[in-house]
Amino acid sequence: MRSNIFVLLLALCSTSVWAQKSNRPDSYNYTRGIEAIQNNNADEALEYLNKEIQEHPDNGYAYSYLSLLRLYREEYGQALTAANVATKKIPSKDKEYVSFAYATRAKVNLCLEDTLKAFKDYTAAINATPDDTRLYEARAQIYYEQSKYDLANADYRKIISLDEGDVMGYMGIGRNANAQKRWDEAISQFDYVIKLASEYSSGYSFRAESYIGKKQYDKAVDDVITALSIDGDNKAFYLMQQLADSAFVLTNNKLKVQTAKEPNESSWPYFIGVVNERQNKYQYAIDAYKNSLSKDNNPITAYRIANCYDDLGNYESALAYCEQAISLDSTDTDYIFQKANILNNAGRSKEAIECMNIYLEKNPEEGSGYYRRGWFKDHSGDIDGAIEDYTMCITLMPEYAYCYLNRGVLYRLKGETKLAEEDFHQVIERDTIADEIECAHYAYYYMGNKDKAVSLINNLIEKDGKSNYYDAACLYSIMGEKEKSIGYLRKALETGFRRFAHIKRDRDLNNIRNEKGYTDLLNEFEEKHRQEVSSDSSDSESFEETTEEIPFSKEGDMCKVKCAINGLPLHFIFDTGSSNVSLSSVEATFMVKNGYLSASDVVGKQHFLTASG
């Protein structure tokens, strides 16, 4: 919601609200407030509009914009208060602004999860401006989320009657048909959308969903690729991964064909990497990601390579690519989080703790950071420190069952039985969804219900053995069934589990640690792993640091550097006699909007006088 106030405004009101009618306000503060909104400056707009309502408390128009601004800032209470005043004070004859006020309040009520009031407000807005198609679309969305497809379709058909060339009516009816698995009806709607707007990616991505429903994967892949080629459609990206599960060879090969068609485009090899990584074909994914990275030095691609190497157990390469991601975008703390995890997987827990400290300094409210640091501290022998971090995680993420389990295990080790049992009860209370059980089997065993624990782990293995073999090895080791534990550990290693440092210090496996079968098994797969890692000789260096010479010309005390932005022949001019290197607000705004600067690049702002004053 925070990206652009002006976009939010356009989504809520007709362009006719901008028209200057004789009976609409034209006071100084009101006018400046509207200009600030158009320039996407929320703080300045609030300042002027608050002054306006102090001077003119009956200006309902100002309240309507204040409601919009508070909505943009996610200050829903103040947004609702302002919207309530706006609906009362805007002249009833000014239908456009009456509609705007109700539509804004409807959006606020949706954010407050009061769909009944939101529905009433959208209906009031429609009564004021019955030809505004966006209002029907917004109300139809509420019906859709309530599975009231007939009522939603009525609003979508109204959109079509108002504007036959607007794709949203047909898209809505098609989406509703998909939700009801009426695939052929949906396809007919999306076919027409594509005829109306052949470059509208959603027509293809939603039709792909219909084809997947009919198991016509060949057509689905074609539509996904078309949608991705238009604008990198998010739904198409999600469906591509779904197709990787249902029709991997077909999806992978068609992406390869697209790569051959557009050899200079970085996205296609990236997508190949995604589908291969999803299928745990990590080396193929790495090769594809590297191809993409060679065309576009993107931190996300380097991050994905790091993840693949981490899953392969090649921690040196994983760290190298994670460092590359950090060097390309030091503002994304997810890369720091991942680096800490890789360090811990490599057995370097103390370094992992230091790295996670950096992450938590930047994200002090992120519960997952405390959970992982607690995990690292446990591995390094700091039980009390681990309990402290798990407790902080529980404070921030009280529904996360694993935190209670790990803390309960540590309390149990310390002999604090009552506290341990309380935590195990919390695990069972939270980890209850049958198809999504994560750790309740451990809690049941610790609480004395072995049969329930075995039943749960067997169900998990039946559903997805590869993801649960290691858990089974841990559970059976805890229960003292050594042969079963070693057998499941073998299955985990055979299906790609390579976290040897974790295996060697996981206390759950202590009961099999001295067994010959365990020792032989680890020796066998560590040797196999060394061969796997050495076979990838291309990774001695993941990236190379170079120094480039930038030509410039000097004119007096000024230096000019030639550059081009969006094809425009420009110069950056630096005054070498100045203590500050600065950009004007116009230049900075231009560069932010075009992706050359982010908010974190701006240190501050300052007013300067030119020589002319």
Regions found by a protein language model. Give the residues of each.
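Helix-start (N-cap) detector for alpha-helical repeat units in TPR-like alpha-solenoids
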Residues: 25-27, 60-61, 94-100, 133-134, ...
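Position-specific recognition of the canonical hydrophobic site in helix A of tetratricopeptide repeat
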Residues: 37, 71, 103, 107-110, ...
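Structural marker of alpha-solenoid helical repeat scaffolds
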Residues: 55, 89-93, 128, 162, ...
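Alpha-helical protein-protein interaction modules
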Residues: 217, 221, 225, 238, ...
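Pepsin-like aspartyl protease folds
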Residues: 529-569, 580, 597-613
